[in-house]
Structures are given as C-alpha cells and as structure tokens.
Amino acid sequence: MERNSRRILVGKVVSDKMDKTITVLVETYKNHPIYKKRVKYSKKYKAHDEQQVAKIGDKVQIMETRPLSKTKNFRLVKVVEKAIL
C-alpha cells in the first residue's frame, strides 16, 4: 500500500486511557438516497500514539497503516487543534 493512497481521517479524541493508544471519533455526512437529507454518521477508530501527545478533546489527523493489533489499524499523524480546557 503506497503512502499517498492511505486513508487520512480527521476526528476528535474521546479516550486516551490506554497506553500509546487513542480512540478517535470521526463524523461524516452522507446524503440519504431517497429523502436527499444530509445524515450524520459517526465511527470510532483506535489509533497508535507513540509519544502520547493527544489528549481528550483534541482534534487529530490519523492515517491508515498496517494492523498494529486486533483493532488498531491507524496511527496519529498530527494534532490539528488542542482542546480548550
């Protein structure tokens, strides 16, 4: 898999309790095929955070990678926006 063909997603960190792992909530919008209304879909991804820089509430960018564990297929690219606490 080429580096530029990997999926890159932007989402919000909802959990950082695991060691070197964050849970990222990614929200997407799709048009309903019949009613043509925009419907919001959300999905959680587990991502590898080697330096443990991401905290809850941060907006982050994650990239698809080889499987790192049973459920972890993404890694943290960068923190786009820090959470305001």
From Swiss-Prot:
The keyword Ribonucleoprotein applies. InterPro entries: NA-bd_OB-fold (IPR012340), Ribosomal_uS17 (IPR000266), Ribosomal_uS17_bact/chlr (IPR019984), Ribosomal_uS17_CS (IPR019979). GO terms for cellular component: cytosolic small ribosomal subunit. Keywords: Ribonucleoprotein, Ribosomal protein, RNA-binding, rRNA-binding. One of its GO terms (biological process) is translation. Pfam families: Ribosomal_S17. One of its GO terms (molecular function) is rRNA binding. Gene3D superfamilies: Nucleic acid-binding proteins (2.40.50.140). SUPFAM superfamilies: Nucleic acid-binding proteins. Part of the 30S ribosomal subunit. Belongs to the universal ribosomal protein uS17 family. One of the primary rRNA binding proteins, it binds specifically to the 5'-end of 16S ribosomal RNA. This is Small ribosomal subunit protein uS17.
